[in-house]
Amino acid sequence: MIATGGVITGLAALKRQDSARSQQHVNLSPSPATQEKKPIRRRPRADVVVVRGKIRLYSPSGFFLILGVLISIIGIAMAVLGYWPQKEHFIDAETTLSTNETQVIRNEGGVVVRFFEQHLHSDKMKMLGPFTMGIGIFIFICANAILHENRDKETKIIHMRDIYSTVIDIHTLRIKEQRQMNGMYTGLMGETEVKQNGSSCASRLAANTIASFSGFRSSFRMDSSVEEDELMLNEGKSSGHLMPPLLSDSSVSVFGLYPPPSKTTDDKTSGSKKCETKSIVSSSISAFTLPVIKLNNCVIDEPSIDNITEDADNLKSRSRNLSMDSLVVPLPNTSESFQPVSTVLPRNNSIGESLSSQYKSSMALGPGAGQLLSPGAARRQFGSNTSLHLLSSHSKSLDLDRGPSTLTVQAEQRKHPSWPRLDRNNSKGYMKLENKEDPMDRLLVPQVAIKKDFTNKEKLLMISRSHNNLSFEHDEFLSNNLKRGTSETRF
């Protein structure tokens, strides 16, 4: 049984091998037919189109090309006449004819026959024919070369135009992308409005600085609708915790935002003004990257000692009432602004003065005694040069805590060499007024001396007040207001 099983398995294996071999033969047999049926592979056509210039035959080089062809044809004809084969039997037959018959044939033949009879088989034609043909071929080759050179020049010009057009297209696309990126970064897409809030002080400072020193006064317009005032008031309240009250409210007045004359003092103190810029800052210049110009370094007088211990809410409400009236200049054409006030003293550290009387005198004056110090107002009243001189040389006399009558100027203060002046810095484009009346002499207010007895604590406070440094952190500012009673600010 075992032997028969082995034989059966062997036979099955042999059958499998035979079937596999037969299949291989069947597959190999039609292979030559398939090889013959394979199509011949063709070269793929190039998709790149070669742009070339035209061969312009209507040109001087084309004229010389045609001339060379004609000269070469003439040379070929001359060579054919010189090397034309001769036939001797025709010549022998013609010699038998009489002289009279030959004369009649010559007269009837004409000029062409005479020419062929004279120059046929001549040595001149054998020599001049190839020479003229060579001259014609030379002219043809030179003209053809010039034509192809002109075509190559045209192709180069075409390629250069293509390159320039692609470069210009890429450059315009990059400019559009940069404008879009700058618009997304700065928020100034085209002529859209710039919203004023507590965190946009740097952009307002840059825009107003450009407008004041470059003559862009007409590019600004004020929008004083009720809805926008309410919206900006809400935004100012939401961002009021970022800045101290005096600094946040005085920054609006420093930026030169002044209301229309029909507004009352309550509208001025609202602080909700919206400034719109049109085509001042381009897409490539970001207002956030402009440097902040340091206009003034001054120490602001603190309120009275009795008011130091008041709550922060009362201090904020009081500072908001004084925010828009902080920077004022007396009107030059009115007589009311030059009336001396008995309770107002100039900024002089050598003379002692009452803190409470200063605060009450600043609150006593109304808004009609002066005008906000803005680029447009200064330009209307005094001109561009005098407004710059006003902002630069008398920056020490500006008090952000006082009323309109506190802006006093003295000759010693104007000539002090240590104070910053714009005409000593990079204020190019403005000429200093010479041999003319100084407009700052109109702002002189007579000094009124008030005698009062002070305690030792008040004297120490006044002495320490004159030597305080400017603080640039809001937390220290608030703590110093509550503890020492000093208020510092920065622009």
Curated annotation (Swiss-Prot):
Compartmental location: Membrane
Membrane topology: Multi-pass membrane protein
Lineage: superkingdom: Eukaryota
Residue ranges crossing the lipid bilayer per the database entry: 62-82, 127-147
Region: Disordered, residue numbers: 16-41
GO cellular component: membrane
Record's keyword annotation contains Glycoprotein: yes
Spans within the Extracellular topological domain: 83-126
Short name of one Pfam family: DUF2371
Disulfide bonds listed in the record: none
Main localization, broad class: membrane
Signal peptide, first to last residue: none
Summary of the tissues where the protein is detected: Expressed in cerebellum.
Entry-listed glycosylation sites: N100
Residues found modified as Phosphoserine: S350
Cytoplasmic topological intervals: 1-61, 148-491
Annotated keywords: Glycoprotein, Membrane, Phosphoprotein, Transmembrane, Transmembrane helix
Tagged with keyword Transmembrane: yes
Xref: InterPro entries: DUF2371_TMEM200
Ranges of biased composition (kind: Polar residues): 20-34
Similarity field: Belongs to the TMEM200 family.
PANTHER family: AGAP005329-PA (PTHR31815), TRANSMEMBRANE PROTEIN 200A (PTHR31815:SF0)
Protein's name in the database: Transmembrane protein 200A
Organism: Homo sapiens (Human)
